[in-house]
Amino acid sequence: MPYAHITGWGKCIPPASISNDEISKIVDTTDEWITSRTGIKSRRVSHVSTAELATVAAKHAIACAGIDAKDIDLVILATCTPSTMVANTASLVQKNIGAVGAAAMDTNAACSGFLYALQAATAQIQAGMIKKAVVIAAERMTWYVNWSRRDSAVLFGDGAGAVVLEAADTPAGLLATKTGCDSTDRDILHIENFGSDLNKYEPIGPSNLLFEGREIFKRAVKGMSEACDDVLAQANLSLDDINVLVPHQANLRIIQAIQHRLKVPDEKVMVNIGQYGNTSAATIAIALCEAVEQGLIKPHSNIMSAAFGAGLTWAASYIKWGERVTPISVSDAQLPPCDKTGLELVAPAVKACKEAEPT
């Protein structure tokens, strides 16, 4: 059976940001309130589409792998903020990167999306159906934000990350995984005012990202920790064998609680939520790239990753890194210049959200 090695990695971080102090100009909050409850200090706001974020991240990953985009067999995009529903956003990314003829599909498992997509692409390689895939997670979560609601306005950001998978004979890549969904209480985390169930001929107003924070905290910590235990058992490993933990970056308190429950020391945990906020499916993809860039991931590292999202979806994965931690080549792909600040980018949405609030 072939294995699916990660041979390339890349990210796309929008240049415009909104700090906690700037958020306090929009909703009633403070830097101390946000930081103490979430660990977030800043978040990015994209001036371009989800497809453009995904394209730049994918181009960096492809260059890093040193392959020709025309040799890619599958483009899979994890997102809950697609640029278009029909046709899917992955098809536009496929066109943009020049992966001529490659299969292209979107997948939506909310914050668990990247690990779901990684599993799907890995399975196709292991089955001998394809040889090369690019797996992308890209989100414009600020598009969903109701800027009159403090609870969600402070949490989310935009960004994208990607990896290239290639068939190989030696054991590396995604070697064990556990995915699932507890739909019993799916309504504790959802977006209202969005989807084809709505009557589009009636005024809809801003979308609302609704969640029960305390309940989600408990379920996220329990679900991700238990999934990690299951994956370790699958792989016949102990926590001492794990070199790096790359958790979903939803909330620093959740990360610390999982870390405590699994007894993983600080130096083994990748954390970047402070500068990006929660980018949903993209958090793990971006964190994985930065863990390599920062030297946290080394050749042959054993990596554990876990996520929890709306649905309520969850996933945990054991990834064995390969030999290489440096790019074969570098892409010059970049976003077009942004001539606005983060606050200026969201100003029209802020105005609309506040006007829609009941008086």
From Swiss-Prot:
GO molecular function: 3-oxoacyl-[acyl-carrier-protein] synthase activity; beta-ketoacyl-acyl-carrier-protein synthase III activity
Pathway: Lipid metabolism; fatty acid biosynthesis
UniProt main location, coarse: cytoplasm
Keyword Cytoplasm set for record: yes
Subunit structure, as described in the record: Homodimer.
EC number: 2.3.1.180
NCBIfam families reported in the protein's UniProt record: fabH (TIGR00747), PRK09352.1 (NF006829)
Annotated InterPro entries: ACP_syn_III_C (IPR013747), ACP_syn_III_N (IPR013751), FabH (IPR004655), Thiolase-like (IPR016039)
Name listed for the protein in its UniProt record: Beta-ketoacyl-[acyl-carrier-protein] synthase III
Gene behind the chain: fabH
Catalytic activity as recorded in UniProt: malonyl-[ACP] + acetyl-CoA + H(+) = 3-oxobutanoyl-[ACP] + CO2 + CoA
Alphabetical keyword list: Acyltransferase, Cytoplasm, Fatty acid biosynthesis, Fatty acid metabolism, Lipid biosynthesis, Lipid metabolism, Multifunctional enzyme, Transferase
Assigned protein family: Belongs to the thiolase-like superfamily. FabH family.
Presence of keyword tRNA-binding: no
Active site per the UniProt annotation: C111, H248, N278
Location of this chain's protein in the cell: Cytoplasm
Region annotated ACP-binding, chain positions: 249-253
Domain of life: Bacteria
Record comment regarding domains: The last Arg residue of the ACP-binding site is essential for the weak association between ACP/AcpP and FabH.
